[in-house]
A protein has these predicted regions:
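A general alpha-helix detector
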Residues: 16, 60-66, 106, 110, ...
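Anion-binding and metal-coordination hotspots
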Residues: 3-6, 72-85, 96-476
Length: 476
């Protein structure tokens, strides 16, 4: 019979914890690129040094959360259990094999009560700036999209509520341009629905809409997923660069449309980086987004969108526009004149009924019961026309094709490798903090791995070419 190895579970040994962690372990790479002095300085006012019992090292608490997000552990409770038995995790925290790990409730309390609300944003920005200082970012083209995160709420526990319809960011500017056109047409200006001190210069709305509100987590929103499935969710509206680094994120309820939350993400990223191209999917193809990006000197890259009108009858492109006379001409030569502009920014063109009554194609052009054809186009339609011409260029096609390699890859990694399919947190503030830390960990992982590869290449290059002494070093 084989001489099997004896049980060594109770064998006392003397071991060096440093030797047990592989040299190429991810946490070693992260420890090499991270600095924590700024965290001690930032959090020093939140700890008392001359009263009470000694507190837990705040950097250790932050490292525990980073471990959770780096390795896709679903909860802090499970993270606490994993750290207890994982040698590499203990090494990263600076704890020995027999040291007690801080309880997960201590970590949760620190982020909810003790640490400042903006700490997670500062950690995210610090890691992003470190990547920027090492020339790893390429924000010349950014990619914006949103992904849903399943909320910790029972979809069967809800109530219907009437809530005020939120005013759009551009409502004030749109109202002013609409009134300018209406005055030229001899029409009465549209009055504001709200007070004159509206932050966007007027244009708020007193309209109310019915929404499904969760009684478990009122901050989330009902997301319709497919034809039959509905669930409460949050949405992370995210922007990344060409190399997959996450540049900004805005978390909203799951029933907020992508184009509504776009402004905050766009303004945040473009205020920090020199952006030339902005690539987005069809959900962002609106007149306002096209106008704002073009007015800012950026090039929007948007996809083809299928015509959603009736398949029977004339299509919008069958009507020819004359910019000098500001009229549309139907396929039978009848002019449709600009009669008014409504509060939504739609220019309304109408034909003359006496000419259309006897037209043989009256039913084909979808004229109304008065025998009059009504044609509408947006006041900012020319910006959408420019976007459409950009879409057809080789550069536009090339940049849009990179979405699957950038923003879609970010969401895939976040859900598959970093446990972002659902959240245990409740409340918009808590979920926002959770998402920012997760994206900070993803940026940190990419930063550490790329820095490690660069250092290995530099070491090999120096050994092969001794005369080369100015090897690139990591910038802190």
């Amino acid at each position: 019979m084989e001489d099997w190895r004896k049980d060594a579970r109770h064998e006392p040994i003397i071991v060096d914890l440093e030797a047990l962690v592989p040299k190429d372990h991810l946490l070693r790479k992260i420890e090499k690129v991270m600095d924590y002095e700024w965290l001690y300085e930032r959090l020093d006012p939140y700890y008392c040094h001359d009263n009470g019992r000694p507190g837990t090292d705040p950097v250790v608490l932050i490292k525990m959360v980073l471990i959770q997000h780096l390795f896709g552990i679903p909860s802090l409770r499970q993270t606490y259990r994993e750290i207890q038995v994982n040698v590499a995790y203990r090494w990263f925290l600076g704890y020995g094999l027999l040291d007690n790990i801080p309880h997960f409730a201590t970590v949760s309390y620190a982020f909810c009560k003790r640490f400042p609300d903006e700490l997670t944003s500062e950690i995210f920005e610090h890691i992003l700036n470190k990547a920027l200082n090492n020339r790893m970012l390429d924000p010349s083209a950014i990619f914006i999209d949103g992904t849903h995160i399943k909320a910790s709420a029972n979809k069967k526990k809800f109530q219907k509520e009437r809530v005020a319809k939120a005013a759009k960011v551009y409502s004030g500017q749109l109202r002013r341009e609409v009134n300018t056109e209406r005055e030229k047409l001899g029409k009465k200006p549209i009055e504001d629905d709200d007070d004159e001190n509206h932050p966007q210069g007027g244009g708020g709305s007193r309209e109310t809409v019915e929404k499904t509100v969760s009684t478990t987590d009122p901050d989330c929103g009902m997301f319709v997923k497919g034809e039959h499935e509905r669930q409460f969710a949050y949405e992370a509206h995210t922007a990344c660069d060409k190399r997959g680094f996450i540049l900004g994120v805005e978390v909203t309820a799951g029933n907020i449309h992508d184009s509504v939350a776009w402004d905050k993400v766009y303004d945040d990223v473009t205020s920090k980086f020199d952006v030339q191209f902005v690539a987005m999917d069809a959900g962002y193809k609106t007149p306002w987004i096209a106008k704002k990006t073009l007015d800012d000197g950026k090039i929007p890259v948007l996809p083809y969108t299928r015509y959603k009108g009736s398949k029977e009858g004339y299509r919008p492109w069958d009507y020819k526009y004359d910019p000098v006379k500001d009229v549309f001409t139907c396929p039978h030569g009848q002019e449709l004149r600009h009669t008014t502009t409504d509060r939504d920014g739609k220019r309304i063109y109408r034909s003359t009924p006496k000419y259309c009554v006897s037209c043989l194609s009256k039913s084909y052009c979808k004229a109304n019961e008065k025998g009059q054809k009504v044609f509408t186009t947006h006041i900012w339609q020319e910006y959408l026309d420019i976007v459409e011409s950009i879409r057809k260029t080789d550069l536009g096609k090339q940049i849009y094709a990179q979405r699957k390699e950038t923003i879609e890859r970010v969401f895939a990694d976040a859900k598959e490798k970093h446990a972002m399919r659902y959240t245990h947190h409740r409340g918009l503030a808590a979920v926002t903090r959770w998402v920012r830390l997760k994206f900070a960990a993803m940026n940190l992982k990419k930063l550490a791995q790329w820095s490690w590869k660069d250092s290995m290449f530099s070491l090999l290059f120096v050994r092969c070419c001794p005369i080369y002494k100015n090897a690139p070093t990591f910038a802190y």
